[in-house]
Amino acid sequence: MGEVYDFFLSSYSGYSRVDIVLEFLAFWFGIISVVFAKKQNILVYPTGIICTLITMYLMYKVSLLGHILVNLLYTIISLFGWWNWSRRENNDLVVKVSKFTSNEFTKSLLIFFIIVFVAYFAHDFFATNFEGQIKELDILTSGIFVTAMWLMANKKLENWILWIIGNVITIPLYLSSDKIILSIQYVIFTILAIQAYIEWKKSLSK
């Protein structure tokens, strides 16, 4: 039992109780948000915004600037997605699950490269302590996650593929920052994203 405690909580020995509570809240709101997204429930957005605001604070404290940028953009895109998912015409939802077109694929690539570019210069401008592979992973996942969020806001099936890829990359990134709880969260995110892809694909064929 002591070994389990050491594994999960020893890395938090220097953290305030408030920060530990906030990380647990981000953990649960993040998972709840993905569950709502999986079910195409609009509550994905208010729960997700709570998670992103908390996560921005936590990432600021460990200088993961790419993820601060990601979560700021999550919040902005979530507001758009909230509005977009709620739109109706003749009492029928306007935005439904679909695959992206070649034009939307091009837009997604453009969003990805813009975010990678911004995240790269954000690291250099703020002179973060992260170098080499960790810095590169933070920049890469920034581009992946913002692009995935944009695709989700437009109910594109491919958003889940990007979430899966980004989640798998993020797990070791958070482990290297002693964010054990958030690392476990991203393992759960990966499982939920796989399930969500399957569910959205089924709804696409209906």
Residue spans for each PLM region:
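Hydrophobic alpha-helical transmembrane segments of multi-pass membrane proteins
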Residues: 48-58, 77
